[in-house]
Amino acid sequence: MKGKFYESEYEKALIDLLQAEGWQYTNGGNIHRQLREPLLIEDPKVNDLRVYLQNQYPDLADSDVTEVINYLRHVPGQSHFERLRNTFQLVRDGYRYTRHGDGVNFDIRFIDFDNTDCNIFRAVNQFEVAYGMKNDVRIPDVLLFVNGIPLCIFELKNPTKLDADIAQAYEQIHTRYMRDIPHLLRYCPLSCISDATDNNTRLGTTYTPYEHYYAWKKVNNEDPSAQKGIDQVRTIVKGVHEPSRFLEILRDYVYFPDEKSGREEEIVCRYPQFFATRMMSDSIRRAFKEQTSKGGTYFGATGCGKTYTMMFIARQLALRCKELGSPTVIMIVDRDDLQTQAGKLFLRSQDFLQLGTVKVISDREELKTELSLRDSGGFFICTIQKFCESIGELNTRRNIICFSDEAHRTQIRLSSKIKVVEHKDIEAKVEQTSAGAVAVRIIDESK
């Protein structure tokens, strides 16, 4: 009983933290529903998806709202991964619904990302999900619903029991739940495992390998890194699950490769990638406004996921920086094997990037031609050798953004132009130097 008491107390403490950040709380046992139905659509008192859609689209009849809900419930896919990816993209991007009778179109959005207060955020524990011929049930510890859609699953382990740890929490989600209640997990892009001990509260996805679950140790970039177990629980709630931050991460920092790639992987950003993306995007926008042509420099430790950070930045520039007018991005690498490595990732990420054509460039003339054919969009990968003074300017358009991967190898005199600010753990700071360049240094010692 003692162990059970402590586990239930931890669950309650987590819910209290979520409530403090703006999540409504409901005990799953008080929600009247068919136990196989993961969406909150049946109980008149907890009918979040229908209520949200009726509030957002008052011109739709009840029958139309039911049809929209059923469209979400029956997203196709030949495998669990395909259904997860397709469902997530529908929830994130919405779709166009044509009303019966008059043919009027409605752009349905299951989440209002631009207006956080228009959404319904609900934390639920003891949420039974039935499966099998005998209607056995699984009960995830805590589920986070946005507008009645379960988008994050928490699995907790007793902090006081030595034989219960986050590896078991991982197995619970990735083996037992995936096997028994995939009809719930098809909606859940995010998962969190925790036993409230040091470095054991970690964020991932339902397709993240155990070793790649990652602690989120800062609420804001300038904060000190959380070191103690309960502090890390508070930090992940404030840094990931605060409603507006939660929507920001869902919108732009959850990555699936293109369907045609055939790869089954789902990635959520780590917190240094999140803060670096924010800072670099702001720096690029500032440089564009001030016409300095100096977007910034980002330093990351080996293995910290710099290529994914560049992908997150590119998506931000494409979708969230309207003043750039859908820029063209050129990724410059300094050797052919990097060109191949980076090219493979970006070539299978066209849907995520939202920049149109993604292409590896073979020579200078091809790059010049591609730039001349467009006023916006496009993502091109090429080596530094494609550039030389003899060919002159390739293009004078202002909204061409160049990423230089492993740039320190080709910028021998970098120190004469920028000042690097170093901080312990994971810290990112921007400093303007006399030469006008911006340096961002991230040192990763947190894993």
Go through each PLM region and give its residues.
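Conserved motor-coupling elements within RecA-like helicase/translocase cores
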Residues: 361-380, 393-397
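Short beta-strand/turn micro-motifs composed of small residues
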Residues: 194-195, 333, 404
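Flexible cofactor-recognition loop at the NAD(P)H-binding site
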Residues: 409
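Short beta-alpha connecting loops at secondary-structure transitions
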Residues: 327-330, 391-392, 444-446
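Conserved helicase motor
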Residues: 336, 358-368, 383-389
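Conserved D-loop-proximal element of ABC-family nucleotide-binding domains
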Residues: 412-413
